[in-house]
Amino acid sequence: MEKTETSPEMRLFGPGGERLYLTALERQRFLAALDEEHPMDRLYCHVLHYSGCRPSEALELVPRRVLFEEQALVFRSLKKRKTDARGRTKQPQYRTVPVPNILIENLDLVYGIRALQKKQKGLDIPLWTMSRPTAYRLVKRVMDRAGIVGKQATGKGLRHGFGVAMVTAKKPLPLHVLAQMMGHTDTKTTEIYLQVVGEEKRQMVSDAWEG
């Protein structure tokens, strides 16, 4: 009998039931633990936190994809099929993700993005030159400092925590909007964020009672 494999991206819990996403409190602690990091490293972690992007997608971010008027970042969506059903090469897919204005302003403060865009120079040079392993160690270091221990203490845990936060907010983000923001092809993938437990689920039930 053929064994069915499940993509890690599709799970909020490990094989033993361990949580793979950050709770609201853990997300707050992660942000608070960033104070000791270099401004550039701090911004990398802020991008992960506020956009829900994949760590490797953040590493590809370039000045051209920082949108000031829209207060958004543009990411190339990874984990997409590179060929269509007929084997033809597909064009890269991008998505726009709204982020807090303070993040846009801090990116400009550290990298001088407005000036680069005005001069039309260096627009396609990645903001971060660190490797994926270095980025992984950065996130792990901040998690350790924040006292976050477990399989959720990763960049993917941050991404899942973002998804959970969006569906457990007082005004939950519609799944089709969240799917676009996270680069999901199908909203069925995004529905995993409804499988929340603990305080997040209690908050959803409480909101439903109040409604």
Briefly describe each language-model feature range.
Residues 3-28, 83-102:
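DNA breakage-rejoining catalytic core of tyrosine-based enzymes
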Residues 20, 24-55:
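Basic, Lys/Arg- and aromatic-enriched nucleic-acid-binding interface segment
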Residues 27, 100-150:
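Active-site/catalytic core of tyrosine-dependent DNA strand-transfer enzymes
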Residues 34-37, 118-123, 137-180:
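Short, basic (Lys/Arg/His-rich) helix/loop patches that form interaction surfaces
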Residues 37, 47-60, 169-173, 184:
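A short, glycine-centered helix-capping/turn motif at helix boundaries
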Residues 60-109:
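Conserved tyrosine-mediated DNA breakage-rejoining catalytic core shared by Y-recombinases
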Residues 79-81, 182-207:
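Catalytic-site neighborhood detector that most strongly recognizes the C-terminal catalytic loop/helix
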Residues 159, 206-211:
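Short, basic, alpha-helical segments at the C-terminal edge of helix-turn-helix-like DNA-binding modules
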